[in-house]
Amino acid sequence: KPLIESGCISCGQCVSVCPTGALQERTTMIKETPVDTVETDTTCSFCSVGCSLKLESCGDMLIKANPDKEGTVNAGLACGKGKWGFDCAMLEDKLEDPLVKEDGAFRDADYHEAFVLVAKKCQSVAAKYGKDSIAVAISDRYTNEEAYAMKRMAEAMGAKVLCMNNRESGLEKVTGLNASPNTIDELLSTNLILKVGFQDEASRVIALKIKQAEEAGAKVMTVCNGENSLALLKEIAKAIIDSGKAKNAEGYEAFAESLESVKVGEAAKAVADVYMNAKKAMIVFTQ
């Protein structure tokens, strides 16, 4: 049976822990040859988990990416994107120099020419339509340092900064912070984990932590892994309210009133009972 048809998630851990060297990874080099590499500590930018990686490079060439065993977030774990996705930095058709469009076609330009052209165009548009007409769009894949540098440049131009994947955070409205109130390692010391709309494929490292917690005795329940998720969540919330165990939450009365007409099904009641009786429970969801 081909490996790709098995439960393999292409994380590369088998290669990393192989004690004999029988398993080896393919390198980005055309010809296999020993090279002296420089190791650089970095953070994976493929998702928001923030796994620590050690990139090995030789000159301008990236050779391999290894998960950092001492990483506070991933502790030596990595997903397929973090382990193998570094080669996107060396794509042959990757844009490396500025291009200027003239007469419907692009031509190469140096950075000075590009900066001057952008500044003049921005000044022209702002003078005609106002400063609010200028915006700088950045990728959510940027590092904090890159995003900060782009923000400073936009401020100098008097422009807005737009992120291409900047969705409104529901978590911030509930907790007041657009970040998890718990750490990933707390998954390993909990009794119950509710996976609400969470797909393992979206975050393999978190999924591995959940699997470790389950092997240590934690109960894992998958909730709303499909359609009609909001209806089931309302039923679970109504069951908890009907139990009388949740009365001190901010905005409780208005929330309880909004659920008065909700009828609680058997599945929702079962989930609510398990959740309320757990000594330590965590909810994992994909926003």
What name fits each language-model region?
Residues K31-Q287:
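Catalytic alpha/large subunits of respiratory electron-transfer oxidoreductases
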Residues K1-G12, S16, G21-V38, C58-M61:
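Ferredoxin-type iron-sulfur electron-transfer modules in oxidoreductases and energy-metabolism complexes
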